[in-house]
Amino acid sequence: MQSLQQQPNTHNSSPEKIILVVEDDDSIGSMLLETLSQETPYKPVLVNDGFQALQAVRSTKPDLFITDYRLPNMNGIELYDRLRRTHDFDDTPAIIMSAYLPEDEVRKRRLIGLSKPFEIDEFLETIEKLIQ
C-alpha cells in the first residue's frame, strides 16, 4: 500500500470535503476508499498508520477522521489525542473502528465507535450525520 492513496471522486461537490481514513489492513482500507469514492460526494484520503496521518494533516485539513483502533506505532485513540493537541482539530468529528473498542475511552472523548464488522449502510449514514 502506498503511504498516501487518493481515489478520484465521481461526485461533484463544492467545496470538496475531505475524509482522512487511517487503516493498516490493505483490504479494508481499499474497500473503505472505494466505498467512500463511489457512494459519497467526499474526497477520501487513505493512510495506513498514525504517523502518516499526522503528516497528511499538514497538507490537508480533513472534515472527518475515520481511524482503526489497532494501528502500528500508536492506536487510534492515541492518534486522536495527538491530533487534538498538536493541530487545530477540536471540532473535527472522528469515527473509531475496531472489533474491540475500549468503550470508556471512546465515551470520554465523545468519539463515534463502529464495531467491526459493520454494515456499509450504517457506516455511510454515520458519515453523513457527522460531516454535514
Residue ranges and their predicted role:
Residues 68:
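Active-site residues of response regulator receiver
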Residues 72:
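The feature encodes the CheY-like receiver
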